[in-house]
């Protein structure tokens, strides 16, 4: 199994906690799925903690510290603040997989908007009251497909 690692030279805007967490993840040879199961979170949410894009709860910090053998006080100091979301990726992104996600929004963004507006009215899909998951699907020919589910609360615009 290949594991996601971190090259800090490619991600200079990530918080110190990212290097700490990824180093311990590599040492323990754990996948995000395994770590997520241990802390009781979704694997994408777990990866978001590692990239400094999601807030870790005190319970998350305790469980990560224990699982990854990271000093609790060090991890608590690094993860107890509020995330500075959105700084980790330059726009447009250069990493090919992240660029494909960006490209999906470029190509289908207005189509999604039109369909969502027709179904829900004038509003937006929350990225705060939100969940996501990634699944692997294999078709009859043996081709692997990535299935990404985005689930956000619908927030109608207020009339004032």
Curated annotation (Swiss-Prot):
SUPFAM superfamilies in the record: Cyanase C-terminal domain, lambda repressor-like DNA-binding domains
Enzyme class (EC, first level): lyase
Gene Ontology molecular function: any one: DNA binding
SMART domains membership: Cyanate_lyase
Keywords: Lyase
Active site: 100, 103, 126
Name of the molecule in the record: Cyanate hydratase
Pfam families: Cyanate_lyase (PF02560)
Catalytic activity: cyanate + hydrogencarbonate + 3 H(+) = NH4(+) + 2 CO2
Entry similarity comment: Belongs to the cyanase family.
Native species: Emericella nidulans (strain FGSC A4 / ATCC 38163 / CBS 112.46 / NRRL 194 / M139) (Aspergillus nidulans)
The protein's Enzyme Commission number: 4.2.1.104
A GO biological process held by the record: cyanate metabolic process
Function: Catalyzes the reaction of cyanate with bicarbonate to produce ammonia and carbon dioxide.
């Amino acid at each position: 199994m290949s594991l996601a690692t971190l090259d800090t030279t490619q991600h200079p805007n990530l918080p110190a906690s990212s290097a700490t967490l990824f180093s311990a993840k590599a040492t323990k040879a754990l996948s995000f799925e395994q770590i997520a199961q241990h802390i009781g979170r979704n694997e994408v949410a777990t990866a978001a903690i590692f990239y400094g894009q999601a807030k870790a709860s005190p319970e998350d910090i305790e469980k990560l510290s224990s699982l990854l053998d990271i000093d609790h006080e060090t991890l608590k100091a690094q993860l107890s603040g509020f995330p500075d979301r959105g700084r980790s990726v330059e726009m447009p992104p250069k990493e090919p997989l992240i660029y494909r996600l960006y490209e999906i929004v470029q190509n289908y963004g207005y189509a999604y908007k039109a369909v969502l507006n027709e179904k829900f009215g004038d509003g937006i899909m929350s990225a705060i009251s939100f969940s996501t998951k990634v699944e692997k699907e294999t078709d009859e020919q043996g081709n692997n497909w990535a299935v990404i589910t985005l689930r956000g609360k619908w927030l109608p615009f207020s009339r004032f």
